[in-house]
Design a protein with these regions (language model features):
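Ligand-binding pockets and gating/stacking loops
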Residues: 1-105
Length: 105
């Protein structure tokens, strides 16, 4: 699994973080980014989802980080909806999402 927490702004000079990036730089862009997954039953050469032509927004099959985590659990044979208990003995699901079944062979 290889992902970052942000993409890059689709246009130079757009400041989204307030860090004062220069007019020829790109800033963080949390609305659309890429990831790579391999092994553990993932389809070889498969591309899932699509962004618009500028890479600023997903337009087909977006995957939320929760769904990615559920897919990782699934690949290990762990049900993402497994109930675990925290330090206060409160029940919690590992993740409230379903695995992205299209990723798997």
């Amino acid at each position: 699994v290889c992902v970052g927490e942000f993409g890059r702004s689709p246009q130079m000079g757009i400041s989204t973080s307030g860090n004062g990036n220069s007019a020829d730089g790109r800033d963080h862009w949390p609305y659309c980014y890429t990831g790579v997954v391999a092994g553990a039953g993932i389809k070889r050469g498969y591309v899932h989802g699509e962004s618009d032509k500028t890479g600023s927004a997903p337009i087909e099959n977006p995957v939320h980080p929760r769904e990615l985590l559920a897919s990782i659990y699934h690949s290990f044979g762990i049900n993402p909806e497994t109930i675990v208990y925290n330090h206060l003995n409160q029940p919690r699901e590992l993740v409230k999402a379903q695995a992205v079944s299209e990723l798997f062979a």
